[in-house]
């Protein structure tokens, strides 16, 4: 049987920032059920790689195909094929968690109010739906951003340090949710300094040191 083509494929990917080569000739493929953890020392280009893969940056050389199309040039609505959660929570401080998520869903994947309330409940923010985000703690703001992972959405998640500012309970819950997403056929590429305790069958580590210039 011929295997299905990869959902995401990077070929000979090279990244230069501020006159410094971070990595070059990087190849990777992501298929159903995969979880890729991008590792490497600070400054090795982990966040840059994620941004290249989702089309937020252009590579110095090489190319990225997402669901068969060049990343960042999707013929359909942005965000249809992947969900990006950066290391900053990227919330509008004066809006509430409900308003922030409603706005993000309107841009990418529409969700009704019940689904958003359920997502906030899943991350332990029931009762905080209508509180301005600037009044929330750093951990609570991070959970608002991560609530997007509990809403209907794309199969591929790109996550930059998703465990930042979470307490022990929040970390354990997120680990289980990420592994469950992959076990159900989803895909994840992420950076994290956290040592994962639950690894799906499709887990593998991508050490950027192998492609350092």
Swiss-Prot record:
Residues 8-213 form the ABC transporter domain. Gene3D superfamilies: P-loop containing nucleotide triphosphate hydrolases. It catalyses: heme b(in) + ATP + H2O = heme b(out) + ADP + phosphate + H(+). Its main location: membrane. GO terms for molecular function: ABC-type heme transporter activity; ATP binding; ATP hydrolysis activity. One of its GO terms (biological process) is cytochrome complex assembly. Keywords: ATP-binding, Cell inner membrane, Cell membrane, Cytochrome c-type biogenesis, Membrane, Nucleotide-binding, Translocase, Transport. SMART domains: AAA. It is a peripheral membrane protein. ATP binds at residues 40-47. The keyword Transport applies. One of its GO terms (cellular component) is plasma membrane. Coiled coil: none annotated. CDD domains: ABC_CcmA_heme_exporter. It is found in: Cell inner membrane. Its EC number is 7.6.2.5. The keyword Cell inner membrane applies. It comes from the Bacteria. Belongs to the ABC transporter superfamily. CcmA exporter (TC 3.A.1.107) family. Part of the ABC transporter complex CcmAB involved in the biogenesis of c-type cytochromes; once thought to export heme, this seems not to be the case, but its exact role is uncertain. Responsible for energy coupling to the transport system. The complex is composed of two ATP-binding proteins (CcmA) and two transmembrane proteins (CcmB). This is Cytochrome c biogenesis ATP-binding export protein CcmA.
């Amino acid at each position: 049987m011929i295997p299905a083509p990869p959902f995401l494929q990077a070929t000979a990917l090279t990244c230069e920032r501020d006159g410094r080569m971070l990595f070059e000739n990087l190849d990777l493929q992501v298929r159903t059920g995969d979880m890729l953890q991008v590792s490497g020392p600070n400054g090795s280009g982990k966040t840059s790689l994620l941004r290249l893969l989702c089309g937020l940056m252009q590579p110095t050389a090489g190319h990225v195909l997402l669901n068969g199309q060049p990343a960042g040039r999707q013929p359909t609505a942005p965000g249809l094929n992947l969900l990006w959660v950066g290391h900053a929570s990227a919330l509008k401080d004066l809006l509430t968690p409900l308003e922030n998520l409603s706005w993000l869903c309107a841009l990418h994947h529409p969700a009704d109010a019940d689904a958003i309330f359920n997502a906030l409940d899943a991350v332990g923010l029931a009762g905080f739906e209508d509180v301005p985000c600037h009044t929330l703690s750093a951990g609570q703001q991070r959970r608002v951003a991560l609530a997007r992972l509990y809403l209907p959405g794309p199969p591929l998640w790109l996550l930059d340090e998703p465990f930042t500012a979470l307490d022990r309970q929040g970390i354990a819950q997120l680990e289980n949710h990420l592994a469950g997403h992959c076990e159900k056929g989803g895909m994840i590429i992420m950076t994290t300094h956290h040592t994962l305790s639950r690894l799906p069958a499709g887990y593998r580590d991508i050490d950027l040191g192998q492609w350092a210039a």
